[in-house]
């Protein structure tokens, strides 16, 4: 082998705020790999056009242990800026429930086309099937129901329609208005 630069410290790229250094850089040329583990088990790679994190053994954990802080997943917003697409919200977790938050006007899309959308626009929430396929809501629990609930007009919530899996019937709990 010959001599090759694997990485270098670039003092000229350091950032300053006028009185102190705010960022220092270790530079790795394109197509370098940062490899951790005797068998190169965890690798970080940048080719010049894409970046990869590769784990080849065991589970890969991404952990933020700062109290009440989040993990934010951001990407280009379509116009050169960055946007949070979803976050793991540690400030909402209460020990029993964990939260994955999708900001208003986010769309969770499923299928290659995509075909199924779940979204909230800040006011209303929607589940939409966009192709000529069926939308199937299925409960596979033995003797369990599918229950549709909404506001009861007095600040509470009540069931309006139950697909009763125990008694194999449809129950309508409130007045039914059939319109032409």
Residue map of PLM features:
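Intrinsic low-complexity, repeat-rich intrinsically disordered segments enriched
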Residues: 1-180
């Amino acid at each position: 082998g010959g001599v090759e630069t694997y990485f270098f410290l670039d003092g000229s790229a350091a950032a300053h705020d006028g009185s102190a250094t705010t960022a220092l850089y270790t530079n790795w040329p394109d197509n370098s790999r940062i490899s951790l583990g005797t068998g190169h088990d965890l690798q970080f790679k940048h080719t010049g056009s894409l970046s990869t994190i590769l784990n080849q053994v065991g589970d890969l954990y991404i952990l933020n242990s700062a109290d009440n802080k989040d993990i934010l997943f951001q990407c280009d917003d379509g116009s050169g800026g960055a946007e949070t697409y979803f976050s793991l919200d540690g400030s909402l977790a209460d020990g029993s429930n964990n939260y994955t938050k999708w900001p208003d006007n986010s769309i969770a899309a499923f299928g290659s086309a995509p075909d199924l959308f779940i979204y909230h626009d800040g006011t209303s929430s929607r589940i939409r099937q966009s192709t000529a396929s069926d939308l199937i809501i299925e409960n596979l629990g033995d003797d369990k129901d599918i229950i549709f609930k909404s506001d009861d007009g007095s600040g509470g919530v009540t069931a309006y329609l139950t697909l009763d899996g125990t008694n194999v019937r449809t129950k309508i709990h409130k007045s039914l208005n059939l319109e032409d």
